[in-house]
Amino acid sequence: MYETSDFRKGLKIMLEGKPYVIVDFQHVKPGKGNQFTRTKLRNMLTGQNLESTFKSGEKFEVPNVENKEMSFLYKDDTGYNFMSQETFEQIAMSEEDLGEAKYYLTENLKVVILFYNEKAVACDVPKAVNLTVAQTDPGIKGDRVTGATKPATMETGLTVGVPLHINEGDVLRIDTSTGEYVERVSQK
């Protein structure tokens, strides 16, 4: 059983008999009255988003989900294709099922696929991934204002704010929980 104090991004809970994943949450302690938790949830079966508020201390069941480690293979018209390293079984997932995880998938990336009632419903990516910059404006020599950033589009389509010295072809480490630039791994 989980309580509202256990909430974190990515936590899976049962609500009204359906499995949900917590997309975002905020613990609120008003000056007057009891504290509560405001959440944004995504239904793991339908992909629908739900905003809900829970009283402090409310309890939730843990959904019966099975985790399988798989590798991302490729994307085609059937969806995003993954393969189990143990059984070599292949599955395809839609963009809706993947949600934000689709922006972090690169060939052969090891991920954890969540199954609920034998259906792939979600994909957990590593905490940080390395992505190549596909497009960004060139950095101008001498243009080094402290903390300044520019937009960069990664190989997967993700747009990230990066420091001015980053160029196309650079490999960057991206935090998958926030979608933000962490560091440059290698230069072109």
UniProtKB/Swiss-Prot annotation:
InterPro entries linked to this entry: Elong-fact-P_C, NA-bd_OB-fold, Rib_uL2_dom2, Transl_elong_fac_P/YeiP, Transl_elong_KOW-like, Transl_elong_P/YeiP_cen, Transl_elong_P/YeiP_CS, Transl_elongation_fac_P
Primary localization: cytoplasm
Record carries keyword Membrane: no
Pathway: Protein biosynthesis; polypeptide chain elongation
Assigned keywords, A-Z: Cytoplasm, Elongation factor, Protein biosynthesis
SMART domains per UniProt: EFP, Elong-fact-P_C
Gene Ontology cellular-component annotations: cytoplasm
PROSITE patterns recorded: EFP
Localization terms from the record: Cytoplasm
Keyword Cytoplasm carried by entry: yes
MF terms in GO: translation elongation factor activity
Transmembrane regions listed in the UniProt entry: none
One BP annotation, GO: peptide biosynthetic process
Pfam families listed in its UniProt record: EFP (PF01132), EFP_N (PF08207), Elong-fact-P_C (PF09285)
Family: Belongs to the elongation factor P family.
Cited function: Involved in peptide bond synthesis. Stimulates efficient translation and peptide-bond synthesis on native or reconstituted 70S ribosomes in vitro. Probably functions indirectly by altering the affinity of the ribosome for aminoacyl-tRNA, thus increasing their reactivity as acceptors for peptidyl transferase.
Name of the protein in question: Elongation factor P
Source organism of the structure: Bdellovibrio bacteriovorus (strain ATCC 15356 / DSM 50701 / NCIMB 9529 / HD100)
